[in-house]
């Protein structure tokens, strides 16, 4: 997670939780039109009105604090079937589920891995890939998503 993403997470966690939602995580994607993507969840699931309420509340906070110096679009959504994983707690919650990982730095000359989450030990994640356990540092995981099965 970048310094900006950490700062944004700290700023918007309380307002999101005050509305009764869990802040699953955020992504800030820089580009011609940058995007701040916020993932929320609740035990009852998420609907469009929930996303609109969170968007309105977060927009107010960001307008006052103004932490982003470039133009951006704000997107608020549920994590979806291919739920992104951001924290060790997320990985622990989904032990036994299939995941795709993209690493910051290659391990065994590979940056992309897919396997089943086997265990979480502090900041280390064990994933079974093709029958072999591979261990990854959470700090080396750039992006992780559950693999939906239909």
Curated annotation (Swiss-Prot):
Listed Pfam families: DUF150_C, RimP_N
SUPFAM superfamilies membership: YhbC-like, C-terminal domain, YhbC-like, N-terminal domain
Gene Ontology BP annotations: ribosomal small subunit assembly; ribosomal small subunit biogenesis; translation
InterPro entries listed in its UniProt record: Ribosome_maturation_RimP, RimP_C, RimP_C_sf, RimP_N, RimP_N_sf
Keyword Cytoplasm assigned: yes
Subcellular location: Cytoplasm
Alphabetic keyword roster: Cytoplasm, Ribosome biogenesis
Tagged with keyword DNA damage: no
Family annotation (HAMAP family): RimP
Subunit structure: Associates with free 30S subunits, but not with free 50S subunits or with mature ribosomes.
Protein name per the record: Ribosome maturation factor RimP
């Amino acid at each position: 997670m970048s310094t900006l993403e950490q700062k944004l997470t700290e700023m918007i966690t309380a307002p999101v939780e005050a509305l009764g939602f869990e802040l699953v995580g955020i992504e800030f994607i820089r580009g011609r039109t940058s995007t701040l993507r916020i993932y929320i969840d609740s035990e009852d699931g998420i609907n469009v009105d929930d996303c609109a309420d969170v968007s309105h509340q977060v927009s107010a906070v960001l307008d006052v604090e103004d932490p982003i110096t470039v133009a951006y679009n704000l997107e608020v959504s549920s994590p979806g079937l291919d739920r992104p994983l951001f924290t060790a707690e997320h990985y622990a919650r989904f032990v036994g589920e299939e995941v795709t990982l993209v690493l910051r730095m290659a391990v065994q000359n590979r940056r992309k891995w897919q396997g089943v989450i086997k265990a979480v030990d502090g900041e280390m994640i064990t994933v079974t890939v093709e029958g072999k356990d591979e261990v990854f540092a959470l700090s080396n995981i750039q992006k992780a998503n559950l693999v939906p099965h239909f």
